[in-house]
């Protein structure tokens, strides 16, 4: 019996930041550990050789970003279709929003969210027009879209009206497991400084904590300070910190590697995710795995992911966030309860389910 041949394009891993980077890694782990023997998987690149090459990742230099986009376009529209034809591939999985325009293989395109269309003001105008055109151009009648949550599926269904869209929950890194020992009382957020992350609301809530003499609790804001050369939100946050003399209480280590992420989780008393909108929320499942209790905004997607294993505050309201942090600090039983519920909830996000849902598409 002839095996179905599935090609996974991971070229974008060369420049991927935390969210997409983790998605690609987890997809490959899921294939390795739980992929069907009846399917032949072909991976475009050796990820172990790509992992240490960071030249293109989030470069602040426009020329470097342009060079990568040229190489990316050449790969996606010329090299990749040639390889798919040469290797007689049945399905190609593109986890980076974009599929080749011309190829005989059936296409599975992962579009992680609808934020490019929902918040056009958050992206450089010309780049956004180019990238959204590229996304739409690669989608045809042989394409199925995969997205990360039911919330994202609903949003994308408005944009791609005549395309099949399937929601598949990604898995969490198994290394983030049960070692939480918050001796340093960190209140933590891990993620890029982007406008929709609403980190200023978190800093304002934390200021109230300091004003009320909770001086033992340090705020850690880990993640890239700029996104492709644009760092306005970081400077907004930093200016607020400077204005109110909070530098002694807030750490901003910038982009950190996995080993450092594990260490921060292990020392965190609370994980706070104040976003105004997300397609999924990888740090939520990492926190649940790490047994760190979660406070997050009451947006729809977070309720889908966390269910009853998080404490919610009104999105954008720093006073409400302060009240929720205060409750957490003073109620260890509540923290323990939510950690227990989180450990149960996070079992939904496993590698077996992740790849088996993909395989339902091409089986």
Segment roles from a protein language model:
Residues 1-363:
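Carbohydrate transferase catalytic cores enriched for Leloir-type hexosyltransferases
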């Amino acid at each position: 019996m002839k095996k179905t041949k599935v090609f996974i394009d991971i070229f974008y891993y060369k420049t991927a930041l935390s969210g997409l980077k983790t998605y690609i890694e987890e997809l490959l782990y899921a294939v390795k550990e739980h992929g069907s023997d009846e399917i032949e998987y072909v991976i475009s690149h050796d990820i172990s050789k790509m992992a240490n090459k960071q030249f293109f990742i989030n470069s602040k230099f426009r020329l470097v970003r342009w060079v990568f986009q040229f190489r990316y376009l050449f790969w996606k529209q010329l090299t990749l279709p040639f390889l798919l034809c040469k290797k007689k591939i049945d399905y190609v999985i593109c986890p980076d929003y974009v599929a080749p325009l011309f190829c005989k293989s059936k296409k599975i395109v992962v579009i992680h969210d609808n934020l490019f269309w929902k918040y056009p003001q958050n992206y450089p105008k010309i780049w956004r027009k180019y990238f959204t055109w590229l996304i739409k151009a690669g989608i045809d009648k042989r394409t199925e879209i995969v997205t990360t949550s039911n919330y994202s599926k609903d949003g994308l269904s408005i944009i791609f009206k005549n395309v099949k869209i399937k929601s598949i929950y990604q898995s969490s890194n198994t290394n983030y497991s049960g070692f939480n020992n918050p001796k340093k009382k960190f209140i933590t957020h891990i993620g890029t400084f982007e406008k929709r992350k609403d980190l200023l609301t978190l800093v304002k809530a934390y200021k109230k904590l300091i004003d009320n003499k909770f001086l033992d609790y340090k705020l850690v804001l880990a993640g890239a300070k700029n996104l492709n050369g644009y760092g306005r939100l970081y400077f907004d946050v930093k200016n607020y910190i400077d204005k109110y003399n909070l530098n002694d209480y807030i750490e901003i280590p910038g982009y950190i590697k996995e080993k450092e992420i594990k260490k921060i989780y292990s020392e965190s008393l609370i994980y706070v995710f104040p976003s105004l909108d997300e397609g999924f929320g990888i740090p939520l499942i990492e926190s649940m795995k790490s047994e760190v209790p979660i406070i997050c905004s009451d947006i729809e997607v977070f309720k889908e992911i966390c269910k009853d294993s998080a404490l919610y505050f009104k999105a954008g309201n720093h006073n409400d966030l302060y009240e929720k942090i205060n409750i957490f600090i003073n109620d260890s039983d509540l923290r323990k309860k939510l950690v227990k519920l989180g450990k149960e909830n996070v079992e939904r996000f496993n590698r077996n389910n992740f790849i088996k849902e993909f395989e339902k598409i091409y089986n």
